[in-house]
Design a protein with these regions (language model features):
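Short, small/polar residue-rich loop motifs at catalytic or cofactor-binding pockets
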Residues: 300, 417-420, 481-483
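Active-site rim segments in enzyme catalytic domains, especially the processed small/beta chain
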Residues: 98-102, 109-126, 131, 141, ...
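Bacterial N-terminal signal peptides that target proteins for export
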Residues: 1-8
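Short beta-strand scaffold segments in enzyme catalytic cores
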Residues: 104, 109-116, 421-425, 485-487, ...
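Extended C-terminal subregions enriched in glycine
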Residues: 367, 429, 477, 510, ...
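Noncatalytic scaffold domains of N-terminal-nucleophile
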Residues: 23-73, 77, 85-263, 268-270, ...
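N-terminal signal peptide c-region/cleavage motif recognized by signal peptidases
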Residues: 16-18
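Internal maturation/activation junctions in enzymes
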Residues: 42, 337-439, 451-452, 459, ...
Length: 615
């Protein structure tokens, strides 16, 4: 890897040699003297689709798309210095541990779909966490937690935060696994940008400051009634959450990244970091052991797949929820012509409330199956082949009233938000990566490992305490997981990554995004930015982004939907890219710059701070 000047060192040199003027204070719109000004002077874009916030980024040699600019630049730095798309994905994810720690950390889960150009195949990694040895339904019952038969979906009876829903983290194992199998560089190289920024700090943006909310983590008489002192020490600046424009540093995380650079994943799962995790867990009444960490292994699995308008849609399989996007698309493909007497989503169009009604009803049907069956396939048989068959989709058409909203089931407990990052990368060899990494909730469990600068996630909150459920908590089992990432192939060739973060929004968001692109013909940036809905099975509410609410909200309410207008915070964030074959580029390479015969296009959701960067 070529030697480059540290961005931190460069900034320090500039500050040392120049005096700068002090600008006006950075503040949010709501804190200005005239908040109404903000919505009154919104500009109007005239190029491309009306919905899109900017043009697509396009380039031949390599691309990184994610939710935070410094993280995207970290991945691009790796690409430009000899790394491939897999190396760039790990570097980007590590930097997001620094810049979006409420969303993602090495104490959480990881899934990835990797298209390996040399093998002409999509490989799927499940590096999600397993319940520790002592995690049983009986133990939780004795602690006062019980299954609620009136609300029996994922999460029923489980505590939402604190140490009890912490599962063994899989992210670091996954980082090392993808590097060893597909990467060109080492931990030492790909973790360097993140280590530098963790030590030197970075300024907090408005969106990051808004999301920076520590949850209660420590129990008094019940779960989670006070903040973890180690979390306050690590994530607050001068005793308070950081404000926009404030510099945030995490030297403890820098130390952890340096340990990984020198000792690899063993430092996390078998060394001093493992000892610190277990000590913290046991101090709070958790059951994780050193053996749980040392024995952790992720899995290489086969994707769930279906065909939609001739495109192969690959999604994460159980215990991830992503496969429900495939079921939604199957239902739409089979049933829309039945429901609309030969019509299509494209012929209806998004100004017609039936277009949205059909999407929503398809989502309800697929999520009913998702909540009923989704679980760790190593412990329970998930009938995925049946659920994703054309015949099964066709059998569901009669369950929907084309003119009136249905009552969905079964119930489940999900918050509106989901604190997750997604990213997409591609390189000049044709490798492409679709990646999702998460803490689950904002700052996960709220429990920080002292001295190491990372939070423990709370994904175990999506187990259930129903002893008869396939998703009931038990040792070494993976819980139901909202994380979703996908990949699209066409004619057995790689086409597009599919990523959208946002808790229970993810599978339904994937389906909406793919409909935008393949039915309506939206470009990637327009598809990322277009208004979306979010439906909750319980309490059967339909959230519509305000422009969509203004367009069809009243008509959907008249059809029986319980509708509310919301902003984009509930709608997740899309980060996608697509390969476009172009034979004219086959001879364009040189000895120093090579690339596949084509280029990449991208879409980065304006609801986040992110961007697509490329060269």
């Amino acid at each position: 890897m070529q030697k480059s000047i540290s961005p931190i060192a460069l900034m320090s040199a500039l500050v040392a040699s120049h005096a700068f003027a002090q600008g006006p204070k950075l503040q949010t719109c709501e804190s200005t003297p005239q908040p109404a000004f903000c919505s009154a002077v919104r500009g109007v874009r005239t190029e491309g689709w009306p919905a899109q916030s900017r043009s697509e980024v396009m380039a031949q040699h390599g691309m990184v798309v994610t939710s935070q600019p410094l993280a995207a630049q970290a991945g691009l730095q790796i690409l430009r210095h000899g790394g491939n798309a897999i190396d760039a994905a790990v570097a980007t994810a590590a930097m997001l541990n620094v810049t979006e720690p409420m969303m993602v950390g090495m104490g959480g889960d990881l899934f990835a779909l990797v298209y390996a150009a040399k093998e002409h195949k999509v490989f799927v990694l499940n590096a999600s966490g397993m319940a520790p040895t002592g995690a049983t339904v009986d133990r939780f019952n004795k602690l006062g937690y019980a299954w609620n038969p009136k609300n029996w979906g994922p999460g029923s009876g489980m505590p939402a935060g604190g140490i009890l829903p912490v599962t063994v983290p899989g992210a670091v194992w996954g980082w090392q696994a993808v590097l060893k199998r597909f990467g060109k560089l080492t931990f030492k190289e790909v973790l360097e940008p993140a280590a530098q920024y963790a030590q030197g700090g970075f300024p907090i943006s408005e969106r990051i400051a808004h999301d920076w909310r520590l949850p209660n983590a420590l129990p008094l008489q019940a779960c989670c009634t006070s903040l973890d002192p180690d979390s306050i020490k690590t994530w607050y600046v001068n005793g308070a959450q950081p404000r926009p424009g404030q510099i945030f540093r995490n030297p403890d995380l820098a130390r952890t990244l340096r340990l990984l650079q020198s000792k690899g994943a063993d430092a996390f799962y078998k060394g001093e970091i493992a000892q610190a995790i277990v000590a913290k867990s046991q101090a709070l009444g958790g059951s994780m052991t050193l053996e749980d960490l040392a024995g952790y292994k992720g899995e290489w699995v086969e994707p769930a797949r279906t065909q939609y308008h001739g495109y192969d849609i690959l999604e994460l399989p159980p215990p991830a929820q992503a496969w429900a996007a495939d079921e939604i698309l199957n239902i739409l493909q089979a049933c829309v012509p039945v429901w609309s007497t030969g019509g299509t989503l494209a012929s209806l169009g998004p100004a017609n409330p039936l277009y949205w009604h059909f999407l929503i009803e398809a989502k309800k049907l697929a999520y009913a199956d998702l909540y009923r069956y989704n679980a760790d396939p190593n412990f329970a048989a998930v009938p995925l082949a049946k659920l994703l068959s054309e015949a099964y989709a066709a059998s569901l058409c009669g369950k929907v009233d084309p003119q009136h909203a249905s009552i969905p089931g079964p119930p489940a407990n999900f918050s509106n938000s989901g604190d997750t990052i997604v990213l997409s990368t591609a390189d000049d060899e044709g490798n492409m990566v679709s990646w999702v990494n998460s803490n689950f909730s904002a700052f996960g469990s709220g429990v920080t490992v002292p001295g190491y600068g990372f939070i423990l996630h709370n994904r175990g909150a999506l187990f259930t305490l129903d002893p008869k459920s396939p998703n009931a908590i038990e040792p070494h089992k993976r819980p139901y997981n909202t994380l979703s990432a996908g990949f699209v192939m066409h004619d057995d060739r790689p086409l597009m990554t599919v990523t959208l973060m946002g808790g229970d929004m993810q599978a339904q968001g994937h389906a909406q995004l793919l409909v935008d692109i393949f039915d309506l013909g939206a470009n990637l940036q327009a598809g990322a930015d277009m208004a979306r809905f979010r439906h909750a099975q319980v309490p059967n509410t339909l959230s519509l982004e305000t422009p969509l609410y203004d367009l069809v909200g009243a008509k959907l309410a008249a059809m029986g939907h319980t509708v509310k207008s919301v902003n984009g915070e509930e709608m997740g964030g899309v980060q996608i890219l697509m390969f476009v074959a172009d034979p004219s580029l086959a001879q364009a390479g040189t000895d120093t710059i090579k690339h596949v015969a084509g280029y990449y296009r991208s879409g980065s959701d304006f609801r986040k701070d992110g961007e697509a960067v490329a060269w």
